[in-house]
């Protein structure tokens, strides 16, 4: 039996559909409920309870179908990149890095603080990325934050609440580009003006933490969630 992929069919390019439909069954995501309702009660269904939505768990349990908690087999396969993906990621990051370098130079040497705010500088960064012929879109809405706004997790600037630059600011930009060969996500905190003694101390502590982390030997079984406290 073929595996089945439930997806919004209108979002799938026709060429891709033709390539993979010989290997798997393609079903419209809107039909998944009715298909689940027709599963034989003698069947057993494997689900990852940590990531499956309650909708599907509830649907199967109402039909008294036996469910088993299994690790999602796609996770590891998605995490392991092939040579084409690795090469694309490297090239995308190099090109994106050029845009970021131009942006930081512009912020420090060209940008007029009196006529710019959190939104206008984010738009300038996007314009630099768009000059790349392989640029598709932003990988997420740019987090552009001046001073105290930079302390807010996943800050979202609005036209009404935007902050303006002065002669002395800390500016955080968390942004990324979606390219046809890779996706980027980069965060930089930039001092515009003269850094205070306290700022120098805090930045130095963070740098020391990063250096120590980069030299750390991770034992087998170390989780990504362990990285933060190790750096601290």
Write out the residue ranges for each language-model feature.
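Active-site neighborhoods and metal-handling regions in enzymes and metal-associated proteins
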Residues: 1-232
């Amino acid at each position: 039996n073929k595996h089945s992929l439930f997806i919004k069919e209108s979002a799938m390019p026709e060429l891709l559909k033709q390539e993979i439909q010989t290997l798997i069954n393609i079903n419209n995501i809107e039909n998944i409920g009715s298909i689940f309702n027709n599963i034989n009660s003698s069947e057993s269904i494997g689900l990852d309870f940590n990531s499956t939505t309650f909708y599907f768990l509830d649907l199967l349990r109402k039909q008294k179908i036996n469910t088993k908690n299994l690790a999602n087999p796609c996770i590891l396969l998605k995490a392991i990149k092939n040579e084409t993906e690795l090469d694309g990621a490297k090239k995308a990051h190099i090109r994106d890095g050029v845009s970021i370098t131009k942006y930081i130079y512009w912020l420090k040497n060209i940008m007029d603080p009196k006529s710019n705010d959190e939104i206008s500088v984010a738009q300038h960064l996007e314009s630099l990325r768009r000059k790349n012929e392989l640029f598709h879109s932003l990988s997420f809405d740019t987090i552009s934050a001046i001073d105290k706004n930079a302390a807010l997790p996943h800050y979202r600037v609005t036209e009404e609440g935007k902050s303006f630059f002065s002669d002395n600011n800390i500016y955080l930009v968390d942004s990324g580009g979606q390219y046809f060969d890779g996706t980027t996500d980069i965060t930089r905190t930039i001092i515009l003006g003269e850094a205070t003694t306290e700022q120098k101390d805090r930045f130095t502590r963070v740098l020391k933490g990063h250096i120590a982390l980069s030299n750390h030997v991770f034992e087998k079984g170390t989780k990504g969630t362990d990285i933060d406290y190790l750096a601290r």
